[in-house]
Amino acid sequence: SNASSEIEYENAIGWLVGPEGRGINTIIEMVNMTRLDCVIGSAVNMRVATLRAVHHARHRKAFGALLVDQPLMRNVLADLVVESDAATTMMMRLAGATDRAAGDEQEAALRRIALAVTKYWVCKRAPAVAAEALECLGGNGFAEESGMPRLYRESPLMSIWEGSGNVAALDALRAMVKQPDTVDAFFTEVRLAEGADHRLDSAISRVGKELADLENVEYRARRVVELMALV
């Protein structure tokens, strides 16, 4: 699915691409881009899996009716579509913030916090979406020819590359503590829709309460990031 290997260069010539001793700072921008790549990969994986599930349901009959016309299957497909569309929307928003970050402090701050939050949530949700979509195909989904097994095998990888769940959650906390403007940028963004739905307003309020006290927050970092992602 995604073959990996390790390469060792012996007696190779190398050039510094940044100040000596500042490797982490030099590479961090590359890491930001590859984290965005991971979000894109997960969103695409979710979308392909969802489309295959919908296509199958539109053509497969069971108990005398197409699967897509049966209420329980429609419910499952609706959940898949909503989650896939949300991942795609967030991915596009992050890509836009990345394009504008160099000349816009608000976008740069949003990108800093949202990239860590989205890397955690979207990449972690991809395997669950792939598994649910595979189930929609039944036994056919387990057959290699369906393409679903490959999606299922690939789906966990993006959550591991460029910082697994704990790393992404702790990076989000680091941004909140060291760059408080990232928190302001987050709330400015989500409050654009404030008032549209009381459930959204409650979710925003809950995140605000969670972030009001960042002392001893590390043990609940994953939960905080999950709440931010779901807003």
Predicted region positions:
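C-terminal amphipathic alpha-helical interaction region
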Residues: 189-231
